[in-house]
Regions:
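Conserved glycine-rich Rossmann-like NAD(P)H-binding loop of the short-chain dehydrogenase/reductase
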Residues: 15-29
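C-terminal helical subdomain
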Residues: 176, 193-252
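The beta1-alpha1 cofactor-binding region of Rossmann-like NAD(H)/NADP(H)-dependent oxidoreductases
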Residues: 25, 49-61, 93
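Substrate-binding pocket helix/loop in short-chain dehydrogenase/reductase
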Residues: 86-88, 95-97
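A short, exposed helix-loop element centered on a Lys and neighboring polar residues
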Residues: 111-112, 159
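Catalytic loop of short-chain dehydrogenase/reductase
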Residues: 119-120, 124-167, 181
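Canonical Rossmann dinucleotide-binding motif of NAD(H)/NADP(H)-dependent dehydrogenases/reductases
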Residues: 1-18
Length: 268
């Protein structure tokens, strides 16, 4: 997924990384895979179990990172949860609660911990929150009512944080990341929930707007590392990119990100 992609690209560029996940098994697996991919990163990557909707759990990640590496310079909040592809009435109460707690409360927990931590360090710090699902722009997408609503809330929250930091005149930068639509196992599972009558059209749309983590994350990480602007929104799927793809497909250039993803992972 995106989190793994960010960690890999940061490690390639010499950073020290604390990555998190909800289970020890998942975290340990990710750390082992990263050290196999990047052998010289073995002493620069550690993992920590975290429940993003629990403030104490998020604080423990900060404390763990500082204890291991001395300080934290960048906090990239990529944790989130999505259940999409079905109408609002087909979304369960548990799914609604999880999306709101992970995406909205989780973003607030991350911001509270990171900003307070940066202030204690007395150093420049960068906090990035993740947008998506049409929530940042207000674009209405059928089957994404709760997810996009939660991301709309994150956008408003980020704007408020930015205003507060500008008034504080400190060295803490608040930014947002719009990573586009990345093809992952989770996304493909969500696509299977789309009603059969709309699935073919949804797959066609995914092939137009979708991209691979291996493509988006190097570009995003480079911009995070060189970012010096308050309120920067790092956006992968710009209007220019979208128009370019649409024109290419109009003139016969086939784009099939789903088949490429499946073939790379031996799923076909």
């Amino acid at each position: 997924g995106l989190g793994y992609g960010y960690a890999r690209e940061l490690l390639k560029r010499g950073a020290r990384v604390v990555l998190t996940g909800r289970t020890a098994e998942g975290v340990n697996d990710a750390v082992q895979r990263l050290t196999r991919e990047i052998p010289d990163a073995a002493d620069r990557v550690v993992g920590c179990v975290c429940e993003i909707a629990d403030l104490d759990s998020v604080q423990s990640v900060w404390d763990f990172g500082v204890a291991r590496f001395g300080s934290i310079d960048i906090w990239l909040n990529n944790a989130g949860f999505a259940r999409t592809g079905v109408g609002f009435l087909e979304t369960t109460a548990a799914e609604i609660e999880l999306m709101v707690s992970a995406n909205v409360v989780g973003s607030m927990n991350a911001a509270q911990v990171a900003i307070a931590g940066f202030r204690r360090q007395g150093s420049v710090g960068k906090l990035y929150l993740t947008l998506g699902g049409g929530g940042a722009t207000g674009r209405v997408v059928p089957g994404m009512s709760v997810y996009s609503t939660s991301k709309r809330a994150v956008k408003y929250f980020a704007d408020t944080l930015i205003k507060e930091r500008k008034e504080a005149r400190d060295d803490i930068l608040i930014g947002t990341i719009s990573p586009g639509v990345n093809v992952t196992e989770g996304l493909l599972r969500e696509m299977q929930r789309v009603p059969e009558s709309r699935r073919a059209q949804a797959m066609k749309q995914l092939n137009l707007v979708g991209e691979h983590v291996e493509t988006t994350t190097p570009w995003i990480v480079d911009r995070i590392l060189c970012d010096t602007r308050q309120a920067n929104n790092i956006t992968w799927l710009t209007t220019g990119r979208m128009l370019g793809r649409a024109l290419s497909m109009l003139f016969g250039q086939k784009r099939d990100v789903i088949s490429r993803y499946e073939s790379q992972r031996g799923l076909t």
